[in-house]
């Protein structure tokens, strides 16, 4: 998504990811891939290495040892510092990157199941009221916005290799997770009621992904692989909980509490995960070295995030969905 940058000061929280841009849509999209793939810059569409599990292309599921059970477990740690003018924000994040298991089926075919984050929401902003007129009437006011949560993907892939060169594969993906976004308006003067409001989203959906790889020997020790993947777009389902309440001293008044069961499946502007097209090419010299280039394109213009409460950003931030393109090497 295309965004207009803004920032206040951040406070410490526990997040799978921390980014001011995760205030919009389903949050910050994970780069995905196993530790081996991430160490190679996130490539994998054209990777064929029997010693490592490749989750970037369903066709690569079949490129493995035909007798062994394989598993991969990864953790992700990230440290970020954001700055804009005199404002500073920093956060250390920690999350599970992936849990994957792969099994041989028959000869040159194999099966894989895995779990990994698809997107993460993690942000926290705080600012003070600057209007002298308002400060003179009601006193100090603090505005806070914070969000957290993750959307995960549970996937199962199957692939097969034909004529030792052509591999094809298919993958079923199930999305699920919870996203919380909250805002506070806190009055220092106890004669005024402070306001807390926000949205809780419980989401799920499913889609499919398809992949192909073709490997060509260039010499006894060198080969070239081309690969392609396509993930179908899908609507998200689930329910929304919009709430607002006012507090004064120890008294809390509920202003709004609305829960809709599976409401997202009944609306014409349901939030949507975009489709994704990926292509890649690699050059490999036995198991000693390899170079690879990947291109990914995803069109989010029909995601409907701008029109859905709980997905659209509020306040002065200007967010819109567009075409996302990624180059990895």
Regions found by a protein language model. Give the residues of each.
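Bacterial N-terminal signal peptides
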Residues: 1-2
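N-terminal, post-signal peptide beta-strand-biased segments of exported outer-membrane/organellar beta-barrel
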Residues: 6-119
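Outer-membrane beta-barrel porins/channels
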Residues: 8-39, 104-329
């Amino acid at each position: 998504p295309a965004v207009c940058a803004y920032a206040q000061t951040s406070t410490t929280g526990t997040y799978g990811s921390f980014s001011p841009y995760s205030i919009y849509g389903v949050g910050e999209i994970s780069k995905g891939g196993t530790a081996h793939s991430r160490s190679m810059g996130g490539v994998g569409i054209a990777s064929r290495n029997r010693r490592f599990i490749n989750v970037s292309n369903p066709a690569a599921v079949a490129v493995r040892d035909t007798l062994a059970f394989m598993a991969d477990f990864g953790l992700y740690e990230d440290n970020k510092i954001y700055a804009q003018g005199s404002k500073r924000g920093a956060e250390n994040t920690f999350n599970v990157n992936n849990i994957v298991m792969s099994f041989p089926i028959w000869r040159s075919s194999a099966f894989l199941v895995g779990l990994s984050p698809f997107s993460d929401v993690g942000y926290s902003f705080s600012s003070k009221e600057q209007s002298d007129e308002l400060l003179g009437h009601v006193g100090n006011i603090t505005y806070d916005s914070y969000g957290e949560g993750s959307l995960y993907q549970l996937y199962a892939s199957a692939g097969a290799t034909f004529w030792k060169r052509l591999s094809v594969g298919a993958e079923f993906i199930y999305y699920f997770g919870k996203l919380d976004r909250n805002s506070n308006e806190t009055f220092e003067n106890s004669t005024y009621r402070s306001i807390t409001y926000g949205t809780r989203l419980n989401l799920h959906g499913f889609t499919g992904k398809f992949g192909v790889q073709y490997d060509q020997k260039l010499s006894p020790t060198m080969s070239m692989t081309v690969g392609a993947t396509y993930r179908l777009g899908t609507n998200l389902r689930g329910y929304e909980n919009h709430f607002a309440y006012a507090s004064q001293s120890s008294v809390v008044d509920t202003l709004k509490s609305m829960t809709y069961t599976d409401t997202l499946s009944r609306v014409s502007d349901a939030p949507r995960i975009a489709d994704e097209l990926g292509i890649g090419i690699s050059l490999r010299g036995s198991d000693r070295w390899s170079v690879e280039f990947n291109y990914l394109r995803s069109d989010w213009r029909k995601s409907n995030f701008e029109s859905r409460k709980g997905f659209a950003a509020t306040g002065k931030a200007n967010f819109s969905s567009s075409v996302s393109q990624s180059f990895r090497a």
